[in-house]
Amino acid sequence: MAATFYGVGSIALAMHEDDEEEGSGRVFGFAAGDLVRPAVVTQQLFPMTAAAAAVVPESTEQRHVAAAAEQWARPPSRKTRRGPRSRSSQYRGVTFYRRTGRWESHIWDCGKQVYLGGFDTAQAAARAYDQAAIKFRGVEADINFTLDDYKEDIKKMNNFSKEEFVQVLRRQGVGFVRGSSRFRGVTLHKCGKWEARIGQLMGKKYVYLGLYDTEMEAAKAYDKAAIKCCGKEAVTNFDTQSYEDELNLQSWDSELDLELSLGCSGGERAAGEVLHSAPSNQRTSLTFMLPEEEEMTACHRQRSIWARPSLAPAMPDGGAVICPDQHQHHPSSRNMLLMSQVISSGGGGGSGRQGAAELHMRPRHGWSSGGNNWAPPYAARPRLPGAEDDDDDDSAAAASSGFPMGQVATASSSSRPSSSSCSSRRSSTAAATATTGR
């Protein structure tokens, strides 16, 4: 057996057996004559020098491992404040929607997400995002492709504002136009005309706008409906500057929620206290003061009625405030009874009723003469003393006012002398006159 050392960096061990010695090769006591042993075994104990490494050829396995490591190694990403990219797309600002089957592009501007349109491919959506990013944030914005690809687009986008350029990008998308027309919201009808309709309005699937002879007219009808619905944010077929009238009308409608005032103010006794104004389909509580002729009764000086608000000029003279729409709402039976007592209590009877009736039937100054400037129909009318149709008039007035007839009849009879007493007074007066003459 002999041992041999080779080189500085390695140790070589050589074993040699003489073929003449039979049975000398045994393993655990068993013969191993057919076992073939290697002549030299080499083991590396120290690293190789640069010169020795250059001589040793690289194995195939090592080359494959190096190539795979280089392929999977990614350059360090630049830290930005734009947020992570979408999981469904490798491009920035692009998202795939399975419901629509399109690639949609969005960009954030001033804390709001702006929709740029839907596209068939992710590359088209990414280019739309790049153009919007350059327009909103300048040439230093983070984009998906190189800046040299948008040299011509940069020259064109300088002529548009942000809103106008967003409209241009949206019109380039495939989701902008559906149907047989090149305009949004326009479809060729089977009758040969162009049908205009707008979708997703007021919770409905679409709203029919009509049939038009030309495609341009239908497109303009859609634009007007979109502006009326969404205002300046509407997606239109043509430039929104051509619809200035619709935009002004839309801004005017948004400012129509104004405070209304009735302005029912007169003298000291007729000053009306107007509460908070309300729309025409609601009722407003109006409190007014009664005139002097009605203050003689024991009723309260203030009455409260319900009337619809209406714009009317102030009354110059003192008196009860009676709005034109007041006759549509009948008062309660208690208020009617009190008003009948006021008219009937005039001292001598006839003169008091006549004065109250004249005051009541006097036209109200400052109101229109269209039939609403007179007193309400439930007020009492003047009656001649001794008239026989008083009960019939009371019944008719009670029936028209909507409250029980017995209350008006009772109030009138209690404050008015009967016909028998009137006839007895006349006979006694005539007898006294005859005696005096004699």
Curated annotation (Swiss-Prot):
Q: What residue intervals hold the motif Nuclear localization signal?
A: 78-87
Q: Which organism's genome codes for this protein? A: Oryza sativa subsp. indica (Rice)
- Where is there biased composition of kind Basic residues? 76-85
DNA-binding region listed in the record: 90-146, 182-239
Tell me which SMART domains the record gives: AP2 (SM00380)
Q: Partners and quaternary state?
A: May form homodimer.
Q: State the protein's name.
A: APETALA2-like protein 4
The family database entries (SUPFAM superfamilies) matched by this protein are listed as: DNA-binding domain (SSF54171)
Its cellular-component GO annotations read:
nucleus
Is DNA-binding set as a keyword in this record? yes
PANTHER family for the chain: AP2-LIKE ETHYLENE-RESPONSIVE TRANSCRIPTION FACTOR, APETALA2-LIKE PROTEIN 4
Q: Which gene encodes it?
A: AP2-4
InterPro entries of this UniProt entry?
AP2/ERF_dom, AP2/ERF_dom_sf, DNA-bd_dom_sf
Regarding protein family, the annotation reads: Belongs to the AP2/ERF transcription factor family. AP2 subfamily.
